[in-house]
Amino acid sequence: MKKIFLLSIALLLTSLLKAQYPGGGGGGAPGGKMPSIGHLYGKVLDAKTKESVEFASVALLWFDKDSAVAGCLVKTNGDFSLDNLSFGAFRLRISFIGYKTIEQKIFMNMQNIDKDLGNIMLAPDEELLKEVVVTEDKATVQMSIDRKVYNVDKDISARGGTGLDAVKNIPSVTVDADGNVSLRNNSVAIYVDGKPTTLTLQQIPSDQIDRVEIITNPSVKFDASTTGGILNVILKRNSKPGYNGVIMGGIGTNDRYNGMASLNIKQGKFNVFGMYNYNTQTNYNDGFTNRINATLPPSSTYTGTINKFYNQTDTNRMKNTFQFARAGFDYYINNRSTLTISGNYVHGSFNSNDFQHYVNNDYYGNFASGGDRVNSTRTSFQNYTGQINYQHTYPKQGKEFTTSLTLNGGQMNTTYTYTTYQEKPALPQILQTSNGSKPSWMYTYQADFVNPINDYTKFETGVRSFMQKSYTTQQTFNKDSVGDMVAYTDLTNNYTITNLTNAAYVNYSSRVLGINYQAGLRFEESYYKGEITNKNISFSYMYPDAKLNKLQYCFFPAVYFSKKLPHNQEIQVNFSRKINRPNFFQLMPFVFASDNANIQIGNPQLAPEFLNLGELNYNITWGKINFLTSFYVRYTQNPITNIAYPLVSNPNVLVNTYQNGKSSMVEGLDNTLKVTPIKGLDLMANANIFYTNVSYLSGTQTITNSGYSWTGKASISYKFPGNFTLQLNGNYQAPQILPQGTTRVVEYADVTISKSIKQKLTFTLLLSDICNTKRNGTHYDTPLYVQDLSRRRESRYLRFSVMYMFGKMDSGIFKKMKQQKKEGGDDQSGMGGGF
């Protein structure tokens, strides 16, 4: 063995000493200074016995000459690894006594600095090995069989903002005044790094988002409850050797401030990352509610005056503060196994003061009653997330096993104060306070295995377990005639929510007659229970139950087909079945919130709604033009709809509740066009045109509402000389169909200008809602009442931010620091000014 080892050393030295490094670059390209951060690794095996070839020599040579760049000996287990490699074209030469020397072409660039060469077989007979090519730059829009990926790095309007700013310009995505996000006019599930999260987009800094995956029809890998699709937010991760970081600060009108710092260090087997972000802003909001009640016959349960007109105006001031911290590390156990441990911490507050003025007029327009109401809200929250991920890849390209455990916890505390001043009839001041506390936790465990059988065939399987538990206490007090605060039991609630889902899936994809297909089946076992513990009220469901009933609520298939056509064309067809289970507030037959004219109550008779989703996608690229169109259909059985009607005991009050409709159908055409006519100019336009038909039962009568609607987006971005960038974004949402009415038109435009200096320092100025036109609202038209509601959150503001990026790609940075310290620390040139 000793002789073999010495011969191997001699063979390796022979390869390395054939020529010196050109230009003294020490691993860089000849005459250049490319970053030396590449990494190649693999395993050398005997082609016949499949045993490791210990002490085989591995040498990396320049592509067009025999100058050696790097080399090593194969370890006992067959592994080899070459680090600190520059970018370019190379030849990998592997040789050993008694085996045929083989060479393999290697191409490396910035887009993939780590490359697993798999199992390389040494045999007496010469074998031809395939070239290894590192992937090209990512396109702005990427389309695969089950998702589309939008890289948001170039959206300069999102800098210094939140996750809402990062997604509001994405085609087919809309954001309302309350921060609710919709995809093709449906509520969408928010994932972070492929996992469900308790975070909202408003709590995630936009500068920490690398890209957003838009999954309009999720495959069986994901929850069957993702009926509106998924926005999978991928946070930034940097695995380049050395260190890099970002420092950012911003200021805006109306007390808008933000700051962020992040740092990433990779050395040897560890990649450590951390960041902190602070964001605060003040918003001024206003709105109104105008209602006209129909003429009703006398009621035996209500003998007072039934008012004809109700008008309410609102003005609101809200201050939001967020702090977001993230830290973690990757540990590269070996060439194919990685362990990642990370954690997030979020802390913040919402404080608002809302002033309402309301007036009731009778059928003759005379003033009947009115007054003022002041609502004060103080909310603080914290959220923490811990995650452990393990990934193991195999020599076979694409084969991998991943498993993860995610723990989320949080606490929210809220104090509401309602003060009512009644003008007519004159009444004493009414004071009501409510204190709420909501601790919650959630865990998700997931394991996935992917096994490619050949270039076109792949088998996937996985399991997932999800559990969520929350405990809410809400105590309400009214001020009595002598000034004491007395408990108000009607609005005092202590409730607990338990949500459990266990799932397993199988997925098979292959190719036949040039058509790629994917077929999968998901099974979900679900349990849900909500309890109002202080009133002994509860509701629960379990699918399937103990007797295995309702199995139809548990199986969810999905199929996908795609075909690449000549001239850069691709066509896709997909179908899936989903379920939307009613939640606690939709089920509980109890008043949860109220004001002078509205109350909300659940319906314990609600059943799940089932959705059948289908899409036909077509994508084509002509040079600098890319066009993507999608025809989609959503058919819903037993849709859960929100309806409202006058309270029988007091028709002046509107009851808001839920019920299952008969069915609903949405058909739409979603079109996105991206054009780069000249260098530096990027144009994007999106139009989503859809038809909605929804029907529900009102007593014994079937009520139907239907019609067309559309949303549109457009953006223009141009890079001027001097590293200036100008971006203009416009959004339009036409009135959309509701069960009892329509929404209000929403329209606004933003403009952003950015200046970059040496790709290190960037200044950005944003003017949001240039014309101050953004407003949300609804119009309801029923046989019992007609109501218009409008709300406007302050959306026109200026925001200025400065971002500084620093770093050095150097895998031996700490070794150099240690060496410099030994030498007295006089030479700092290799550190770019210090670290």
Q: Where is each model-derived feature located?
A:
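Short acidic/polar hinge/loop motifs at secondary-structure boundaries
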Residues: 169, 195-218
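N-terminal periplasmic accessory domains that precede
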Residues: 116-120, 163-166, 199-200, 213-214, ...
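Short, acidic Ser/Thr/Gly-rich low-complexity loop/linker segments typical of extracellular
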Residues: 63-79
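Short, acidic, small-residue-rich periplasmic hinge/interaction motif at the N-terminus
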Residues: 23-32, 45, 57-61, 95-97, ...
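Surface-exposed extracellular loop regions of Gram-negative outer-membrane beta-barrel proteins
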Residues: 527, 567-612, 633-656, 736, ...
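Outer-membrane beta-barrel translocator/receptor signature
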Residues: 224-232, 239-288, 320-323
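Outer membrane beta-barrel strand-and-loop segments of large Gram-negative receptors
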Residues: 433-434, 442-446, 488-493, 601-603, ...
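A short, solvent-exposed loop/turn motif at the edges and junctions
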Residues: 62-67, 89-105
